């Protein structure tokens, strides 16, 4: 009997999902991306060699795994080709291992132009997007005017549809944002030049996954970003434009919702956030800088330095609820090495003095919130690279146990370094 495992972030992204997916795919036949786009940055370190993936699933480096980009992903053809070329230059036969849904919306240059024009116009109120056209591409999808991978099968019809949509968006770019128009012919030529490469990888993803399920194959579904960036359940409007939560698996891949067996939530041992938006436990002091440097907290996609803070249990509990988490993988425990004390946010004090233990829904509700902390002893011992649970410092074990107690979810995997091997699997999701 096969197992279907979902791996997703429980915070604001950058929790370390890529490494965990890569590790667990040793037993998987398929790895599926079901939302987001090349705004994701999944870093893998295998035998000391670093690979950063933005669009292609993290199972691509394993020869026994088929990687799939599902319909919930917005696909930038140029970004995909660059990623494929880079991997192929290293000997990875991407075209033999990668499949696409024909329903993937395409991200094209006018989406990028709109994304950047809007951020510029917002000024101090900018959301902090990656500027890669993700939001505008999802807008076109919902408005039913977007172009999809499947449109590339008929190039004449594609050209007609593209002209209509370029004219539509150029009107907004030129007359509202006072920016330069996007060149229709240039966009058309660039896309058609690689159209046959993309269409050659197209498959009926829902049918494929259902057949795999019936055969008993193990499948993994790889989330991007994190729960608190979900378009519906995140800190709106400082969110991404897709459903980053477990509910997005069914809609973004075509797998029936009853066929998810285990949901693994990746939780970093502290909190980080890129871009604007609420962050109650943010540390703008020496400890915050310590976490940033020790954790190398700089975005794999944008290179921006990440905001850092203590682990927010209140926010993580919201992720537990929304995703019906089966277990946690705690990452970057080693970054806390050397701190005399560590803190967990266990509640919020509202501006009117009330104490609450749930997160607000919209960004406005987070204004003026103060974190309520529980302080625990830190540890001086080095946990980096430790591969045996019994060899972790007692204070670190106490920290992990307290997270389990406060969330009601077991920590099934512990990561103590970036390499695939620097991991303790206490309970394998495929065996749970």
From Swiss-Prot:
The record's listing under Pfam families reads: Adenylsucc_synt
Note on how the cofactor is bound: Binds 1 Mg(2+) ion per subunit.
Its pathway? Purine metabolism; AMP biosynthesis via de novo pathway; AMP from IMP: step 1/2
Task: List the keywords (alphabetical).
Answer: Cytoplasm, GTP-binding, Ligase, Magnesium, Metal-binding, Nucleotide-binding, Purine biosynthesis
Q: So where does GTP get bound?
A: 13-19, 41-43, 306, 332-334, 415-417
Kindly list the biological process annotations in GO that this record carries: 'de novo' AMP biosynthetic process; IMP metabolic process
Q: Does the keyword Amino-acid biosynthesis apply?
A: no
Compartments annotated for it: namely: Cytoplasm
Q: Which reaction does it catalyse?
A: IMP + L-aspartate + GTP = N(6)-(1,2-dicarboxyethyl)-AMP + GDP + phosphate + 2 H(+)
Cite the active-site annotation. 14, 42
Q: Where along the chain is IMP bound?
A: 14-17, 39-42, 130, 144, 225, 240, 304
InterPro entries named in the record: Adenylosuccin_syn_GTP-bd (IPR018220), Adenylosuccin_syn_Lys_AS (IPR033128), Adenylosuccinate_synth_dom1 (IPR042109), Adenylosuccinate_synth_dom2 (IPR042110), Adenylosuccinate_synth_dom3 (IPR042111), Adenylosuccinate_synthetase (IPR001114), P-loop_NTPase (IPR027417)
List the PROSITE patterns. ADENYLOSUCCIN_SYN_1 (PS01266), ADENYLOSUCCIN_SYN_2 (PS00513)
Q: What is its EC number?
A: 6.3.4.4
Residues annotated for substrate binding in this entry:
300-306
Q: Annotated Gene Ontology MF terms?
A: adenylosuccinate synthase activity; GTP binding; magnesium ion binding
Q: What cofactors does the UniProt entry give for this protein?
A: Mg(2+)
Where, in this chain's numbering, is Mg(2+) bound?
14, 41
* Primary location group: cytoplasm
Its cellular-component GO annotations read: cytoplasm
Q: What does this protein do?
A: Plays an important role in the de novo pathway of purine nucleotide biosynthesis. Catalyzes the first committed step in the biosynthesis of AMP from IMP.
Q: How does it assemble?
A: Homodimer.
The similarity annotation says: Belongs to the adenylosuccinate synthetase family.
Q: What's this protein's name?
A: Adenylosuccinate synthetase
Q: What gene does the UniProt entry assign to this protein?
A: purA
């Amino acid at each position: 009997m096969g197992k279907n495992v979902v791996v997703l972030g429980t915070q604001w992204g950058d929790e370390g999902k890529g490494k965990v997916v890569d590790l667990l795919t040793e037993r998987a036949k398929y790895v599926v991306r079901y939302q987001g786009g090349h705004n994701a940055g999944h870093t893998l370190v295998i035998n000391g060699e670093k690979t950063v993936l933005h669009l292609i699933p993290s199972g691509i480096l394993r020869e026994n795994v088929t990687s799939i980009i599902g319909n919930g992903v917005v696909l930038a053809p140029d970004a995909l080709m660059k990623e494929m070329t880079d991997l192929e230059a290293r000997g990875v036969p991407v075209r033999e291992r990668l499949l696409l849904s024909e329903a993937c919306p395409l991200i094209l240059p006018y989406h990028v132009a709109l994304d950047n024009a809007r951020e510029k116009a917002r000024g101090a109120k900018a959301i902090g997007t990656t500027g890669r056209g993700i939001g505008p591409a999802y807008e076109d999808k919902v408005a039913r005017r977007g172009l999809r991978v499947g449109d590339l099968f008929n190039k004449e019809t594609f050209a007609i549809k593209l002209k209509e949509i370029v004219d539509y968006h150029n009107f907004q770019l030129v007359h509202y944002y006072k920016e330069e128009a996007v060149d229709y012919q240039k966009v058309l030529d660039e896309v058609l030049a690689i159209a046959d490469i993309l269409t050659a990888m197209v498959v009926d993803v829902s049918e494929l996954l259902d057949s795999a399920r019936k055969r008993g194959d193990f499948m993994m579904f790889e989330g991007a970003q994190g729960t608190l960036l979900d378009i519906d359940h995140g800190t709106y409007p400082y969110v991404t434009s897709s459903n980053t939560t477990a509910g997005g698996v069914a809609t973004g891949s075509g797998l029936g919702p009853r066929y998810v067996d285990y949901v693994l939530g990746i939780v970093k041992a502290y909190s980080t956030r890129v871009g604007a938006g609420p962050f109650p436990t943010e540390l703008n002091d020496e400890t915050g800088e310590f976490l940033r440097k020790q954790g190398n907290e700089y975005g794999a996609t944008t290179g921006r330095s990440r905001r850092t803070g203590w682990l927010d249990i209140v926010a993580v509990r919201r992720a537990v609820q929304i995703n019906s988490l089966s277990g946690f993988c705690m990452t970057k425990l080693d970054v806390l090495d050397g701190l005399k004390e560590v803190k967990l946010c266990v509640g919020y004090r509202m501006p009117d003095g009330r104490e609450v233990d749930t997160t607000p829904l919209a960004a406005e509700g987070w204004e003026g919130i103060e974190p309520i902390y529980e302080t625990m002893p830190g540890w001086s011992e080095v946990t980096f690279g430790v591969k045996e649970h019994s060899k972790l410092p007692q204070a670190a074990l106490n920290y992990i146990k307290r997270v389990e107690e406060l969330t009601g979810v077991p920590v099934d995997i512990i990561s103590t370094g970036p390499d695939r091997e620097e991991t303790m699997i206490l309970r394998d999701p495929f065996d749970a």
